[in-house]
Each structure stands twice: as structure tokens, then as C-alpha cells.
Amino acid sequence: MTVAQQAPSALNFDCETGNYHTFCPISCVSWLYQKIEDSFFLVIGTKTCGYFLQNAMGVMIFAEPRYAMAELEEGDISAQLKDYEELKRLCLQIKRDRNPSVIVWIGTCTTEIIKMDLEGLAPQLEAEIGIPIVTARANGLDYAFTQGEDTVLASMAHKCPTSAQVQGEDKEERNAIQKLLTFGRKADQEKVESEYVDHQPLVLFGSLPDPVVTNLTLELKKQGVKVSGWLPAKRYTELPVIDEGYYVAGVNPFLSRTATTLMRRRKCKLIGAPFPIGPDGTRAWIEKICSVLGIEPQGLEEREAQIWASLEDYIQLIRGKSVFFMGDNLLEVSLARFLIRCGMTCPEIGIPYMDKRYQAAELALLEKTCSDMGVPLPNIVEKPDNYNQIQRIKALQPDLVITGMAHANPLEAQGINTKWSVEFTFAQIHGFTNARDILELATRPLRRNSQLGELGWDKLIAKDVPAQV
């Protein structure tokens, strides 16, 4: 049930001054250390940071994880201990125990407050110990926890080699994607190369699980587009070659800092495309890449229609229902666009931070989707005030609220269906084939309450509860 609204003619952006109810960006360690297999992440912070990492990722004593806490003590903060000597001692221990290809220093709020010059210490120390060091300020001063990955990738973009630095066979062997597609058979190299159209090199950026990377790479290969590399690569030693004039495209909405670094520092050309989330977004993403590279896309309309047909059983559950985004991980606009295309309405999209330049193509596709589906445009609220949001939720009574973990239980107590937004962060939601996983997550609370009602367990479903949040 939704309150009738007058349809706005263009996207409306509001900005409130609410608190950021989100995880700390140092949580990016939890997926990046698994993605970059030869890395070691050293988080430099306080006991609070350590407690958070333990809660977020588990202790994992026997697994020997490739991340650790460098706990700041009173001597560090009062400048009685030398930062360089302490970090050198820890990095030498990491080199001796794990021997990684790269050490990533993750700065925190405390390193910012005490003005610890990690960027200045790293070049001197990496020359002394012989291991590259990447520094990233993934602190709680950011807007959303997913921006921790953005900071790390922006720092890593500086470390990508140029073609002049990579000679001979090393250049060919760096690219893990190329090796995957050729299966290591040198004899088939010419045949594989003939499947691609001659175009400017393309590098994709964004950390995705290996099956999704393979999937998107193969989707582009069907159009004759060759992916020169991914940032981050599976191994640090396989970072993509990036030269001036290369094309780059992002796969996630929260990577605006990485995009800016690639454009300004590495002189790359950014392909401003919608993000490959949902069949509609994936098709638009591929079409935009093809158009920039001068390639005529083939069969995408049929491919998209085939995926939509396979999703019909889920779409029937949400068609005509409303969804409200409170804002948490910067994926809100892409998810809202996909759910609107599935037949839902979305009165409001809360988002911690909006880079309108980087998300321009996604916002344009959102407008087009609303127009095609004949539904009102959502109101986009940047830095939403949670108290005001809850009042709006009470007035609108949406069928589903996608929210951070802090607000899920209070809203459920009010009889409102909720879904944790963090689940979309860790699920495989990119590409044509993973659209079903998005709908599986989005419809789960609706299906759960429907099934409880059918079983006669209505007392487990809170309805029309007058209590205050």
C-alpha cells in the first residue's frame, strides 16, 4: 500500500544531515584479501578497529588469514615510538612469515587524527624490505563502508605498470584473463585473437568474485571486445598494464575515486556506463562499451528478453509492490532501477553519498526505466536523516524496506518487511545470470511472511503495531 504521489518530471535530489549508520570502511579487508591472493593487509588502528574486524570476519586462528592489526599504543600516539621503526619491524615479520607480493597498509581514523604519514613512509620502507607497499586511508570519515575498496583500488591504480615497464613475454603472461580464455595453449593464440575486434585496450575496475569476472569477460568477448585486464587482478603480480589513452569502465557505483585517479593520474578515458546489475543494466553496460569502441552489439536484446522470461516467477511476487531504500552501501540507485524494471515502485532512494558525474549514466537509465514502466520518479535523498526517514516510512507504508542492520529489527517490530542492504554487497549480483540472486534476496522477507500466514502462524507477523520507533 502506498500513498498517492504526484509524479515529478525529473529526478529530485535532496540532502539531509543525518548520521551515517553504516559499517567502517576497513571492512573492505574482508573481501579484498580473498580477492588478491598474494596480498597481506595490515590495518593500523586501535583496539576498536581490531574488535570490529574480529566481529566482521571471525578470529580465524587456524586459517592463518592474510590480514592483521597493527595496534596503536600510547607510545605511538605520544610520539615516543618512531612510526618507521615500528612499521618496519611488523613488515619484516610479515615478510618472514607469509612472504606476500604486496603489503597493503589500511589507515584508520586514529592515523588521520595523529597525522601519521603513511604515504611518506611507504616508499622508503618498500625499498628497504623489497616488497611493494600500497597505502589506503579507509577510515570512518568516509560516507559508506564500500568506499574502503574504492580507496584501496585508487591507491593500487598508481602501481599498475605501463607497457614500457613490461617487456617481452612478461607482458603477455601478466594478464590472468587472457590466460584463462586461451587455457595456456600457445598454438590457439592466433585463433583466439581473431575472435576479437581491433580496438583500444580496455581495463575494467572493481572487485568481483572470480566466476562473475569470467562471466562478464565472456559476455564482452561475444561482442568481440577484449578485456586487457581487471583492477584488482587475482594476484598483485598480474596487475593490468595501463597506458595513457586506455579505456576504463567500472562495475560498481562506489568506485568514483578510482575512476578519478585513472583519468587524472593515468590519463585514461572513462566509459560512463550504467552498472552491470540486472539484465537491463548489464545490457546497457555492454552496449555503451561497444558503442565507445565502435562495435555493433549483437544479440543483446534477445539475451535480455531470455533472462527476463526466466525471472517471471519472482517478478510476480513483487509486481505492483513498493520498495524504500534507507541508504547504506551506494548500490541503491542500481538496485532501485532494477526493481522498478521488475514492476515495483520506489518512492525514495536514500544514499550516503552521490557522485552525480560518475553515476550520470545510471541516473539516466533510472529515469528512462521509470518512464518506460509508467511509475513516478523516486526522490533521491543524500545523507538521509534516519528519524525523518522513519516518519516517511510510516506515512508511505512500503511493502519492503532495504536498510542497514541497525534499523531492521525496529522496523520489523512495526510490521514492515525489511532486508539487510549488506547482503546485496556480498552476494553475486552482477551480470545476466546473477539477476535471479537479487530477486531471491529481495523477495525473501515477502515470501517468508506469506508462508507464515498460510501456516496460520499470524502471531509471528507483527501487523498494525502502534508502538513508536
UniProtKB/Swiss-Prot annotation:
Pfam families: Oxidored_nitro. GO terms for biological process: light-independent chlorophyll biosynthetic process; photosynthesis, dark reaction. Its cofactor is [4Fe-4S] cluster. GO terms for molecular function: 4 iron, 4 sulfur cluster binding; ATP binding; metal ion binding; oxidoreductase activity, acting on iron-sulfur proteins as donors; oxidoreductase activity, acting on the CH-CH group of donors, iron-sulfur protein as acceptor. InterPro entries: LIPOR_BchN/ChlN (IPR050293), Nase/OxRdtase_comp1 (IPR000510), Protochl_reductN (IPR005970). It comes from the Bacteria. SUPFAM superfamilies: Helical backbone' metal receptor (SSF53807). Keywords: 4Fe-4S, ATP-binding, Chlorophyll biosynthesis, Iron, Iron-sulfur, Metal-binding, Nucleotide-binding, Oxidoreductase, Photosynthesis. Pathway: Porphyrin-containing compound metabolism; chlorophyll biosynthesis (light-independent). It catalyses: chlorophyllide a + oxidized 2[4Fe-4S]-[ferredoxin] + 2 ADP + 2 phosphate = protochlorophyllide a + reduced 2[4Fe-4S]-[ferredoxin] + 2 ATP + 2 H2O. Binds 1 [4Fe-4S] cluster per heterodimer. The cluster is bound at the heterodimer interface by residues from both subunits. HAMAP family: ChlN_BchN. Protochlorophyllide reductase is composed of three subunits; ChlL, ChlN and ChlB. Forms a heterotetramer of two ChlB and two ChlN subunits. Component of the dark-operative protochlorophyllide reductase (DPOR) that uses Mg-ATP and reduced ferredoxin to reduce ring D of protochlorophyllide (Pchlide) to form chlorophyllide a (Chlide). This reaction is light-independent. The NB-protein (ChlN-ChlB) is the catalytic component of the complex. This is Light-independent protochlorophyllide reductase subunit N.
